[in-house]
């Protein structure tokens, strides 16, 4: 399956493997999602499938979104996401996407927004070391110099400094699905995923299979 699925992070727990070792897992309520739009190379310039997730009350959705969803005959959905495909004609408008489309042992990439930490200093935000704490030093948690002198005469873009921490989109790659509960639309994934409980997650088949890695800025 080339499509992904949208879900909601429920929290973390643990499972025990065959050797009796505790394995940290994340519980995700994934889907059911509905296909809300099909795009083709002839009409849109590229082939893609758009899906929707999570019902929403009518008074909380605007008229353009309401009209867009009415074309596909779907209920009012809060979240919409698009996935590129080679041929969108293989999919049916209004069809459901559930956890049944995934398999136990499959590797997936999961994207979400990290927990916001507010304004943070350079030590907490970037893990820099502090200054000396004794011998008359007045530089304990100060950043120190952020540039040179006349050359270059400016601060380079991207300089790691204090600022807002978290709230960024992060993708954790190659996470293994340990268990699937079709009755409750649950995916049990090995390890942790971005975001706090209740946050939206985008789950896609892994682009490359290997050790789990994390991509995204602070």
UniProtKB/Swiss-Prot annotation:
Disulfide bonds: none annotated. Residues 128-167, 199-218 are annotated as: Disordered. Pfam families: Ribosomal_L3 (PF00297). Keywords: Ribonucleoprotein, Ribosomal protein, RNA-binding, rRNA-binding. One of its GO terms (molecular function) is structural constituent of ribosome. GO terms for cellular component: cytosolic large ribosomal subunit. InterPro entries: Ribosomal_uL3, Ribosomal_uL3_bac/org-type, Ribosomal_uL3_CS, Transl_B-barrel_sf. GO terms for biological process: translation. One of the primary rRNA binding proteins, it binds directly near the 3'-end of the 23S rRNA, where it nucleates assembly of the 50S subunit. NCBIfam families: L3_bact. Part of the 50S ribosomal subunit. Forms a cluster with proteins L14 and L19. Belongs to the universal ribosomal protein uL3 family. This is Large ribosomal subunit protein uL3. It comes from Prochlorococcus marinus (strain NATL2A). The gene is rplC.
């Amino acid at each position: 399956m080339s499509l992904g699925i949208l879900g909601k992070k429920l929290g973390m727990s643990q499972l025990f493997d065959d050797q009796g070792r505790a394995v940290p897992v994340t519980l995700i309520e994934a889907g059911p999602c509905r296909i809300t739009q099909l795009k083709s190379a002839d009409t849109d310039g590229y082939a893609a499938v758009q899906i929707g997730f999570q019902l929403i009350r009518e008074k909380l959705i605007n008229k353009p979104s309401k009209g867009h969803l009415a074309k596909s005959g779907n209920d009012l959905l809060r979240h919409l996401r698009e996935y590129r495909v080679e041929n969108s004609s293989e999919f049916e408008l209004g069809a459901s996407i559930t956890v049944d489309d995934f398999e136990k042992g499959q590797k997936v990439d999961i994207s979400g927004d990290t927990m916001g930490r507010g304004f943070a200093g350079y030590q907490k935000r970037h893990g820099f070391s502090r200054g000396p704490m004794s011998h008359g030093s007045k530089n304990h948690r100060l950043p120190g110099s952020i540039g040179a002198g006349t050359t270059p005469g400016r601060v380079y873009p991207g300089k790691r400094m204090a600022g807002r921490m978290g709230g960024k989109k992060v993708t954790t790659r190659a996470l293994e699905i340990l268990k699937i509960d079709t009755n409750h639309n649950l995916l049990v994934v090995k390890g942790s995923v971005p975001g706090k409980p209740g946050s939206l997650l985008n789950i896609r088949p892994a682009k490359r299979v290997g050790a789990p890695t994390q991509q995204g800025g602070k």
